[in-house]
């Protein structure tokens, strides 16, 4: 398949409790191809991507008539040249070639529930399934810099497990249910308190040493008196 430089994507506009859909053309590449070329991704960006995809689906579901995307996968997500993340407009004729790629058996089997055709009626749970599979793909194909810690990894596993459990009694009714599992990136703060304690300890030690030096040395006035007394004793002996 020839690599296109641009795609028609969905632009979601939120206005109060309602969202609106429009379509626009952006220059970029499908997420699946982008991460093959850039497998090492800043952890901050990786977590922001996952949160952004969840948020985009949430906004889509709030649009008029509550539409669903139907087939979420790394080929249906476009990374623009500016670094933005968008869902492809699958109804746009310009994306027909990409749609044919996504219909291939090896891709369908990985990003759709077992035995389910891509044309099945769209639903929130199906969107959640595709998102869970896409996040699994991201984690498998990329290396976060710095690496995800055990807590972040555990939360993302819970998220994907919840997304993929299609037959649970607690099937996802609202995509926002999974947001609580998505870690928020936090810069590691320097240990200012520890450094302050170390500085205070050194200062206290210097004060103690200075005091010890003063105790061990006679006062200059005392040295003068001792010197004069010695001179008087020498005169008397003479």
Predicted regions and their residues:
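Activation segment signature within eukaryotic-like protein kinase domains
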Residues: 49-50
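Terminal C-lobe "cap" of eukaryotic-type protein kinase domains
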Residues: 165-191
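C-lobe/activation-segment region of protein kinase-like
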Residues: 84-162
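Hydrophobic HxD+1 residue recognition
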Residues: 70-72
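Hydrophobic residue at the +6 position relative to the catalytic HRD Asp in the kinase catalytic loop
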Residues: 75-79
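Conserved short submotifs of the Hanks-type protein kinase catalytic core
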Residues: 15-30, 34
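Conserved HxN/HPN-centered segment at the entrance to the catalytic loop
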Residues: 2-17, 65-66
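Protein kinase catalytic-loop region centered on the HRD/HxD motif
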Residues: 54-68
């Amino acid at each position: 398949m020839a690599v296109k430089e641009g795609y028609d994507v969905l632009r979601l506009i939120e206005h109060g409790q309602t969202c609106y859909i429009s379509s626009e053309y952006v220059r970029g590449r499908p997420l699946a191809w982008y991460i093959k070329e850039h497998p090492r991704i800043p952890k901050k960006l990786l977590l922001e991507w996952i949160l952004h995809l969840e948020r985009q689906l949430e906004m889509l579901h709030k649009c008029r008539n509550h539409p669903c995307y139907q087939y979420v996968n790394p080929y249906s997500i476009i990374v623009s040249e500016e670094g933005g993340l968008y869902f492809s407009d699958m109804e746009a004729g310009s994306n027909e070639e990409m749609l044919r790629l996504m219909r291939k058996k090896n891709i369908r089997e990985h990003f759709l529930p077992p035995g389910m055709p891509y044309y099945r009626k769209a639903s929130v749970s199906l969107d959640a399934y595709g998102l869970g599979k896409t996040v699994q793909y991201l984690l498998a194909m990329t290396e976060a810099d710095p690496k995800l810690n055990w807590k972040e990894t555990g939360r993302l596993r819970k998220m994907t497990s919840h997304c993929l459990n299609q037959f649970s009694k607690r099937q996802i009714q609202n995509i926002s249910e999974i947001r609580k599992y998505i870690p928020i990136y936090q810069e590691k703060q320097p240990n200012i308190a520890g450094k302050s304690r170390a500085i205070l300890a050194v200062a206290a030690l210097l004060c103690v040493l200075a005091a010890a030096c003063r105790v061990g040395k006679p006062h200059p006035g005392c040295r003068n008196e001792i010197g004069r007394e010695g001179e008087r004793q020498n005169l008397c002996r003479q």
